[in-house]
Amino acid sequence: YRGVKNPVLIVAKGNDGVMPSISDGAKIYSGNVPGFDGQYVVEITDPDVKSVTISVGEVSTQFRVLNLPTPTIKIGEYWSGNEIPKSVFTNSTQLDAVIDDVNFPFKDVEYTVTQYSYMTEANGITSSHVVNGNKLTEELLKDIKKKRSGDKIMFIGIKVSTPAGPRNAPGYTAKLK
């Protein structure tokens, strides 16, 4: 995976003490990643590399390089598409970007929302308000307080910081309870 330290366990008969090598676009070194088996660590250094080859002696194995999972947005414990009580906005005053992939092995990877747009509607006119950071602004919270049960809230253009660099997240839409 790009942006994380990948654990590698190498078992190569007859090559004890031989340091593995890796193709361009990555680096390999002795070490371990907490919580994983492995005596080597691979880090991807080229953001465009699609695969890397690890070699030990005469044996080489190619590995596909994967991107980190797409960020998913939550407000409190509520996912996009959920009905969300207005009271949530008194306790949860930010957009959280999380990894919603049960097969992703790295549980300590963190994402942070860096920018979003909040869609508002007044007198039939829709407009968006760009916010830098992940906090819900006072203006936005006041707008939500005015809304009624059944009204929708929508966040678009969500930008997220990840260990592998900036990413775009899908929008967030919810209906107020």
Region spans (language model):
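Short coil/turn motif common to extracellular beta-sandwich-like domains
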Residues: 1-8, 92-99
